[in-house]
């Protein structure tokens, strides 16, 4: 009983690896092109100018954050600075 379970699991593992390799071979060009596509998307988003960082946005100084938000020094994110008003 134990041997048949182990053999079944081994066969399923081999089939999984075989089908994964065949799938990667079919769409291999897509995999190679995807890093370039991701880099171009990153450039698009970095080129946008932002007025201020909203809540939980990354920052380096308080002036990066929107009104009533301050840059937390430990984790470098914008959080409420405890002030109210317009």
From Swiss-Prot:
Paired cysteines (S-S): 52-66, 59-71, 65-78
Residue list for modification Phenylalanine amide: 84
Recorded GO CC terms: extracellular region
Record's signal peptide: 1-21
InterPro entries attached to this UniProt entry: Huwentoxin-1
Keywords: Amidation, Disulfide bond, Ion channel impairing toxin, Knottin, Potassium channel impairing toxin, Secreted, Signal, Toxin, Voltage-gated potassium channel impairing toxin, Voltage-gated sodium channel impairing toxin
SUPFAM superfamilies according to UniProt: omega toxin-like
Tissue specificity: Expressed by the venom gland.
Record has Kinase as a keyword: no
Source organism, top-level taxon: Eukaryota
Propeptide feature ranges: 22-50
Chief site of localization: secreted
A GO MF label: sodium channel regulator activity
Compartment(s) where it occurs, according to its Swiss-Prot or TrEMBL record: Secreted
The protein's role, per its UniProt record: This toxin acts as a voltage-dependent gating-modifier. It inhibits the sodium conductance (IC(50)=124 nM) and slows the fast inactivation (EC(50)=1180 nM) of Nav1.5/SCN5A. It significantly shifts the activation to more depolarized voltages and decreases the deactivation of Nav1.5 currents upon extreme depolarization, but only slightly affects voltage-dependence of steady-state inactivation. In addition, this toxin causes an approximately five-fold decrease in the rate of recovery from inactivation and an approximately 1.9-fold reduction in the closed-state inactivation rate.
Other known facts: Negative results: does not show effect on Kv1.1/KCNA1, Kv1.2/KCNA2, Kv1.3/KCNA3, Kv1.4/KCNA4, Kv3.1/KCNC1 (all expressed in oocytes), voltage-gated sodium channels (Nav1) (from DRG neurons), and in a range of voltage-gated calcium channels (expressed in rat DRG neurons). In addition, does not show significant toxic symptoms when injected into mice and into cockroaches.
Family: Belongs to the neurotoxin 10 (Hwtx-1) family. 28 (Jztx-11) subfamily.
Domains as described in the record: The presence of a 'disulfide through disulfide knot' structurally defines this protein as a knottin.
The name this protein goes by in its record: Kappa-theraphotoxin-Cg1a 5
Species whose genome carries this gene: Chilobrachys guangxiensis (Chinese earth tiger tarantula)
